[in-house]
């Protein structure tokens, strides 16, 4: 199976072999004849998201590391940067530029051979899922949405902390204690563990050789790379362990059997797996441990394994996979060492997700439980929006309150507010502003979740430092919210950057459902009876010409929203009247690409602006395309 995530940018290339070793790459080049310029691409076993280029020349194989830069480009050390591994290979087919020769002929994977996955790729999906479950106590759709929207960040988080789940990692123990642990039980050559030496990211590899325990210091350099003295550098400990399980490469011997951590009773919890025969050197032959990564089960969220008691460590005779995580829960990791994720906020899940917070049967709230601040957050034809606090059963919830003008006494305005409340009470998604309820008191009030940073367009106008990948992250979240609306048979009808509110710089929610309509199961569009005060510059041609609204017309609006986001909150069709915009669209013309906007994102905008509604993509397709591009640029 092809690996996802880190190798996604190369999986489509027929000459990409995935997580193979240098020796395996050389064997393939020999199969291909070793002609000068014959080459293949493989996944780096040292650097997260990196690759290695193996090239034949002079009957020898030459290997070049391709690192992924912080801005998402790829480069061979000291060479030019390229948008993708494919672009890099194409460039070096025309310019040697530091390579031993030009790349002349790719060696493609034999028929039926898929890119090989590494140990982390095999474990990653389950590790991420369990990490999200246990860290934020999420289930169902909230869990799925968290994984989809934050997968690149979660992958990096898991990749750099995965060693904590591995049986060979013993945390911060002393040199003397590590020797005692290694010498307990079998004396298999290559038996090993890794311990933390200090709080600065320094570790030690403890390795058994001919009855003696050897200690190799593992240092972290200024860029965060890990290595033994004079050894290869790695992004993670598990990559280092994987490498030295294949070849000694400076060690006295390869790593074979990990010293696993034992519970207080001296038993290893295998989560129901059958026990395997006792450890034997042949079982742990070089490279063999990688090929035996198996599925595993985690404890239920909240289950905590008792910590090992000092002096009560003994070695089980059960064979243990060094790449299989320990059956212990993830430690909560919400400290200052990482940026807050949407799941860290109080508005990711519904306020009624807590079973003790009983959702009222009626949407009406008790005014006595609502406190309002004097300062206005915004205003419009309907009235004002203020910040407030609503006393729920267990917590006080910070809320935004839309207050109808007191003097209006316009039944139409009240009907609009109630219609909006009716739509909102049916929606529950992390990327949509949820309604808490409505209040009938000195004025009619709609009580909603709070998004502190306000409208997306205004935020971007005032924060030009926000990077492309951050904008891609936000518009992807909007597409997830709109995909949910599409699946729920709702048409928004007022999708624009002004109606996307930011909870944090990395968390967006769709708001303002005043024009929204619920479609019946047998309907795929809503037909307005009359032309109202419509945001024409965001509307698809069929809305303007035929008053027909559907999820596909929301897709058109989403394209305009994307243009607003990548132009940092500029107004679309600036200086043009609605009739001029309509005429422009009828001629097949569209807005130009915002300065600095990635070409792929402008291409997606134009796809959203497909004139014929039947040929325009739905949000399922738009979200998937955005997701793939987002994963590619953020990884």
From Swiss-Prot:
Carrying Phosphothreonine, the residues are 256, 317, 345, 384, 530, 582
Identify the PROSITE patterns for this entry. Answer: PROTEIN_KINASE_ATP, PROTEIN_KINASE_DOM, PROTEIN_KINASE_TYR, SH2
List the catalysed reactions: L-tyrosyl-[protein] + ATP = O-phospho-L-tyrosyl-[protein] + ADP + H(+)
Q: Where is this region: Interdomain B?
A: 260-370
Which residue range or ranges hold the Protein kinase domain? 371-631
Per UniProt, the keywords (alphabetical) are:
Adaptive immunity, Angiogenesis, ATP-binding, Cell membrane, Cytoplasm, Disease variant, Host-virus interaction, Immunity, Innate immunity, Kinase, Membrane, Nucleotide-binding, Phosphoprotein, Repeat, SH2 domain, Transferase, Tyrosine-protein kinase, Ubl conjugation
Q: Does the keyword Cell inner membrane apply?
A: no
- Annotated ATP binding lies at 377-385, 402
Q: Which GO terms describe its molecular function?
A: ATP binding; integrin binding; interleukin-15 receptor binding; kinase activity; non-membrane spanning protein tyrosine kinase activity; phosphatase binding; phospholipase binding; phosphotyrosine residue binding
CDD domains attached to this UniProt entry: PTKc_Syk, SH2_C-SH2_Syk_like, SH2_N-SH2_Zap70_Syk_like
Q: What is its EC number?
A: 2.7.10.2
Phosphotyrosine-modified residues are 28, 47, 131, 296, 323, 348, 352, 364, 484, 507, 525-526, 546, 629-631
Q: What would changing residue 342 to T do, according to UniProt? A: In IMD82; constitutively active protein tyrosine kinase activity
Summarize the PTM comment: Ubiquitinated by CBLB after BCR activation; which promotes proteasomal degradation. Autophosphorylated. Phosphorylated on tyrosine residues by LYN following receptors engagement. Phosphorylation on Tyr-323 creates a binding site for CBL, an adapter protein that serves as a negative regulator of BCR-stimulated calcium ion signaling. Phosphorylation at Tyr-348 creates a binding site for VAV1. Phosphorylation on Tyr-348 and Tyr-352 enhances the phosphorylation and activation of phospholipase C-gamma and the early phase of calcium ion mobilization via a phosphoinositide 3-kinase-independent pathway. Phosphorylated on tyrosine residues in response to IL15.
Q: What does the activity regulation annotation say?
A: Autoinhibited. Intramolecular binding of the interdomains A and B (also called linker region) to parts of the catalytic domain keep the catalytic center in an inactive conformation. The phosphorylation of the interdomains or the binding of the SH2 domains with dually phosphorylated ITAM domains on transmembrane proteins disrupt those intramolecular interactions allowing the kinase domain to adopt an active conformation.
One of its GO biological process terms is: defense response to bacterium
Q: What is the effect of changing residue 297 to A?
A: Abolishes YWHAG binding
Q: Which residues carry this modification: Phosphoserine?
A: 44, 202, 295, 297, 316, 319, 350, 379, 579
The segment annotated Interdomain A runs over 108-167
Q: How does it assemble?
A: Interacts with LYN; phosphorylates SYK. Interacts with RHOH (phosphorylated); regulates mast cells activation. Interacts with NFAM1 (phosphorylated); probably involved in BCR signaling. Interacts with VAV1 (via SH2 domain); phosphorylates VAV1 upon BCR activation. Interacts with GAB2 (phosphorylated); probably involved in IgE Fc receptor signaling. Interacts (via its SH2 domains) with CD79A (via its phosphorylated ITAM domain); the interaction stimulates SYK autophosphorylation and activation. Interacts with FCRL3.
- Write down what this protein is called: Tyrosine-protein kinase SYK
Q: Which organism is it from?
A: Homo sapiens
